Amino acid sequence: MPIEAMPTFWRDAELPFIEARQIEDGRKVFYGRHSHEVFSIGAVTSGQSTYLHEKSCQTISAGTVVLMNPGEVHACNPVEDQPWSYVMLYVDANWLAGIQHSHDDGDGLGFQPISATHTQSSKLFAGLIDLYAQLIDPALDALPKRKAAVAFFMLMQRTLGHSTLELKRINPRVVRAAEYINEHFMGTVRLAAICKAANLSEAYLIRAFEQQYHMTPHAYLINRRIQHAQAQLRDGASIIDIAHEAGFADQAHFQRVFKKHLAATPGQYKP
């Protein structure tokens, strides 16, 4: 893989609430449908790509900022082998909730989802690029980076935070199915057991689960295992131990699935 197509990750132990990623040439970078436990925001810095966000799919280009709330299924991929580049930030939702409620008495409300899935705001685009540059600057210590992050996400909140999400119809039995997967994803999870926990038939569960979570139960299970693997990699766990612990057949299977979801190998993601 050309060096330009290699993902670059940035993390700082003094700023555990934020992680950054950059791709300079995304022509050979392909994502499967996936979601994160954190809030994600990114900017297309050159070229264009497809942007799938739950039920919608469109082409976006340089200057576009994309936003994904925790749990929202998405994927960005190249358009017909055309070059494109981007930066991404992954932000702890609880930390972001503190920004959202810094000027009100809603400290106990938690993170409020952002309704916008993308924006052409030039201020947000420029602010995101500037924040990324400051985060990766080795000459800066943690304090100015933290201040820059607070300033940017306050700008995001002022720009987009007052819009409201369309309320989704939630089936509590389907929620119970997802909870069962979350509780047992480290072991063997069979569809029959999920159905029993949710008191739903297999046919209904598969249809209703995909409608609510934009993934099949199996895809949700694999995505949950990948989320766990990311956390373990950040903590320094070995790839072979993670593969065994998270229920993958072997290390090679884990490597393939991880790369399919995140367009990076576990070795590239690992600090």
Regions found by a protein language model. Give the residues of each.
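Short hydrophobic/aromatic patch on the recognition helix
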Residues: 63, 204-209, 253-254, 258
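N-terminal regulatory/effector-sensing and dimerization cores
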Residues: 2-109
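Histidine-centered active-site/metal-ligand motif
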Residues: 33-36, 74, 204, 218, ...
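Residue-level signal for well-ordered alpha-helical positions
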Residues: 79, 102-103, 159, 232, ...
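Short, basic/aromatic-enriched C-terminal tail that caps enzymatic domains
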Residues: 19-21, 256, 261-271
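Terminal helix-turn-helix DNA-binding modules in bacterial transcription factors
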Residues: 179-193, 200, 210-255, 271
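Short, Lys/Arg-enriched, Trp-marked, Pro/Gly-tolerant hinge/linker segments that flank
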Residues: 107-123, 133-198, 211-223
